[in-house]
C-alpha cells in the first residue's frame, strides 16, 4: 500500500492467485489493519472514489487508487505493512447439515466479522483441522477477524490426522500475527461481541488437542462431549486439550471427557 495524500492510497492485491476483479465501490466502509500485529488502526473510512491504477480496466488490475471521504490516520503509511478490509463485502454464514470427509487440508475455514453459525455437521476424518478461524495480512491476505461464531451440535470423528498448515487442534483459531508480543488489542472476538462459542458438540478423537486459540477475547467451550479412542496412534506434539495463546475471557465448563483429561495450557 502506498499513501498518496491524506485521503488517498494505492492498494494492491498481494496474493499472485487473486487479482483482476473489483475490490470495492464508492460508499463502501473499510478499515485498515496493521499487518505486523493484526490490529485495526484508526476509524472506519468510506470510499469516495476507487479506480484501477495499474490497468485501464478492472480486468487484470492488481492496484487500485482509493480516495476516502475523510482523512486517514497519521499512522497509516507505506513505512510498514497495512491491509485494507472491505467491511461491506463480508457475509453472514450459516453452515449446517453437511458431511465434511477426507479433506486433504482443513475441513472448513471461516473468516468474517459477521454472524457465523456452524451446526449439525459431521466432520469425518478431515486430514487437517476440522474448523479453522484464520486471518492474516502477510501470506494469504485473509484479514477478517471473527466476532460472532457459534459452533454447536456437530460431530467430529478422528479429525487432525496430518500436519498441514494450521493443524494445531480439531478446532484451530489461528490468526497469523508476526509480532504477537507487541499486540495490544485482540484479533478475534472483542468487547461487545459474543466471540466464539463451542457448545453441545461430540468429539471422537485418537489424539489430545481439541481447541487451539490465539489472540482472542471471548471463547466459550461448554456442554461438549469428548470421547477418547485408540483408532490411530496419537502423534501430535500438543499434548493438552486446550492450548491458549494470549486469550482473554475464556470459559470452559460443563463438559464430559471420557478419560477425564481436560488439560489446559496458557501462554
Predicted feature residues:
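Extracellular parallel beta-helix/beta-solenoid repeat domains
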Residues: 1-267
Amino acid at each position: 500500500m502506498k499513501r498518496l495524500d491524506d485521503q488517498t492510497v494505492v492498494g494492491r492485491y498481494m496474493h499472485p492467485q487473486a487479482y483482476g476483479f473489483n475490490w470495492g465501490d464508492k460508499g463502501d466502509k473499510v478499515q485498515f489493519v496493521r499487518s505486523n500485529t493484526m490490529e485495526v488502526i484508526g476509524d472506519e473510512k468510506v470510499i469516495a472514489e476507487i479506480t484501477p491504477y495499474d490497468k485501464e480496466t478492472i480486468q487484470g488490475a492488481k492496484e487500485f487508487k482509493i480516495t476516502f471521504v475523510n482523512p486517514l490516520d497519521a499512522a497509516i503509511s507505506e513505512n510498514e505493512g497495512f491491509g485494507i478490509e472491505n467491511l461491506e463485502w463480508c457475509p453472514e454464514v450459516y453452515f449446517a447439515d453437511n458431511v465434511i470427509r477426507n479433506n486433504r487440508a482443513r475441513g472448513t475455514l471461516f473468516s468474517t466479522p459477521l454472524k457465523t453459525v456452524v451446526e449439525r455437521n459431521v466432520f469425518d476424518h478431515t486430514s487437517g483441522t476440522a474448523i479453522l478461524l484464520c486471518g492474516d495480512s502477510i501470506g494469504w491476505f485473509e484479514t477478517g477477524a471473527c466476532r460472532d461464531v457459534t459452533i454447536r451440535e456437530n460431530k467430529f470423528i478422528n479429525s487432525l490426522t496430518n500436519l498441514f498448515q494450521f493443524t494445531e487442534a480439531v478446532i484451530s483459531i489461528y490468526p497469523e500475527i508476526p509480532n504477537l508480543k507487541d499486540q495490544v488489542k485482540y484479533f478475534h472476538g472483542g468487547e461487545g461481541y459474543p466471540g466464539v462459542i463451542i457448545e453441545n458438540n461430540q468429539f471422537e478423537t485418537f489424539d489430545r488437542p481439541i481447541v487451539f486459540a490465539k489472540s482472542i477475547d471471548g471463547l466459550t467451550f461448554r456442554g461438549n462431549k469428548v470421547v477418547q479412542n485408540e483408532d490411530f496412534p496419537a502423534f501430535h506434539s500438543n499434548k493438552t486439550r486446550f492450548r491458549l495463546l494470549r486469550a482473554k475471557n475464556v470459559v470452559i465448563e460443563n463438559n464430559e471427557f471420557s478419560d477425564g483429561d481436560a488439560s489446559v495450557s496458557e501462554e
